[in-house]
């Protein structure tokens, strides 16, 4: 039999794709007929994922900020709930490895700006080797090896994004993903509430009840938008009403944060314009921002209980200030917090027993038994504290890192913060807001400042890295690009100076 040797690769691809499509159609049809919807969703998800990677091509890395910028629903896989970012980063890692093997990309690991992240990761790896957790735990929704998995994927995302170079258009796409993520998260959470689905805490797995439940999700999208506004436009542009819609958006974000119940989020909302005024060197707007913040909060605090009654969740946001609040907030009035106090006590005890190394995310039977006894003892705070302690959500970054992995890890995290802030300052000083590189640098500076502000009330050794290291990797790449540009400009200036000097010498010699 003679075969046509002129069959092209696209023709082969179409034939193979058609055959696979027909086979998959039969498979899906039988699954739907058998009402095996878990298998249907799994297959459709796989096709969508593969299609996304093929469509993006060399821009496959965009799936990392896209997946981490929004709260996508978990994907059922093998009887376990797998988060979309976990699959996205795993897929990106596989493609990155393949492109390294084919010399289309380079992996850059050992350079000075990577040292803080490398030290952090090496320390976590050492503790894991000393106190390992079985691989079966990767199926857990919270705790144990799932946190190690997230740290490993966060490190992979950092390496992938820090080893690339970016254009202005790439950074604009990233901000587009962040805005999309903020909008999607709002719509998804509101839809879940409207459909009656229970709100599950992502750290403990507990169902949240009461007035302070889904409201918490309002703060993250609002802060994303406010941080972007403060990074892209100077205070003069905002307050001079050159773009009046910016102030309108800020007011909407203020109301969202107020209704979120997040006390520290309100402080971050007012912090962003102040940092922007300092970075843009428009210092007069520091006082303008402070005046507006005092007027807004003062009106709400003074008016509460006299002129109007705020919703309970809004009162919670302001409860750290002295005011006429509902008795519901007696235990947290003035900044007091019995819940965090109990968590800090447990974390401090762990640090006393394991000050240098800690035991990582390993959970033994004694901790589980203690949590059960605490829950059986009675009070609502006791039940919450037990679940959060097992989930390593200490609500204090420094105590939490030290309790999990020893005091040295807290020191390493502080070094990471300093390194990130310094790189942000240098990148913004070089690019300013005229380039999206500078906008991202200032955005991350504000974001990191918020992290430091809230370090005594929030934080998780694994989740922090999971949500932030991809941004650190992007910053490292932009910082290295900036250094190369500055070096190139100095070399060019030096050559031009040498050429002018040589030209003058020739002219002088010709005259004499």
Predicted regions and their residues:
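A juxtamembrane structural motif centered on a specific transmembrane helix
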Residues: 1-10, 16, 241, 426-441, ...
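Alpha-helical transmembrane segments of multi-pass inner-membrane proteins
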Residues: 2-4, 8-14, 20-23, 45-52, ...
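N-terminal signal-anchor transmembrane segment
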Residues: 4-102, 126-133
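Helix-loop-helix junctions and helix-breaking kinks within/between transmembrane helices
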Residues: 27-40, 77-88, 212-216, 244-285, ...
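Aromatic-anchored transmembrane helix interface
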Residues: 82-93, 112-129, 136-163, 173, ...
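Long extracytoplasmic/lumenal interhelical loops at the membrane interface
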Residues: 199, 330-345, 349-353, 357-405, ...
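Loop-to-helix entry and N-terminal half of a specific, functionally important transmembrane alpha helix
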Residues: 248-251, 392-396, 403, 414-416, ...
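A membrane-periplasm/extracellular boundary helix in multi-pass inner-membrane enzymes
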Residues: 259-260, 277-332, 349-353, 361
